[in-house]
Amino acid sequence: MPKPGILKSKSMFCVIYRSSKRDQTYLYVEKKDDFSRVPEELMKGFGQPQLAMILPLDGRKKLVNADIEKVKQALTEQGYYLQLPPPPEDLLKQHLSVMGQKTHDTNK
C-alpha cells in the first residue's frame, strides 16, 4: 500500500491488434476491446481486430517497428496508434547500387 501523500502513478499499457485485412498492419489502443476512439472508417479498412499482445509502455525505451514516443503521444491524444507496414525494399535498386560500386572499384 502506498504511503500517505504518495500517489501511485498509473502504468501505461497498450493493447495491440493485428489487422485481418492488411498484412503487417497493427492498431494500438489503450484498453482491450475498446475501439470507441478509433474512427469508423479506419475500423472498416482494418477489418476484424485480432489480439496480438498487451504491452506495458512504462520503462520501455523502444518498440520493434514503431517510435515509442509517437505511440504514447497518439494513445494520449487520439486514443489509438496505427502502425503501417514498412515500405517494400527496392531490391533491384540495392543490387544495381552494389554492382555500380563494384564496377567502379574494379576500374581503378
From Swiss-Prot:
Domain of life: Bacteria
SUPFAM superfamilies assigned to the protein according to its UniProt record, in alphabetical order: YcgL-like
Signal peptide: none
YcgL domain span: 12-96
Pfam families the UniProt entry points to: YcgL
InterPro entries per record: YcgL-like_sf, YcgL_dom
Name recorded for this polypeptide: Protein YcgL
Protein's gene: ycgL
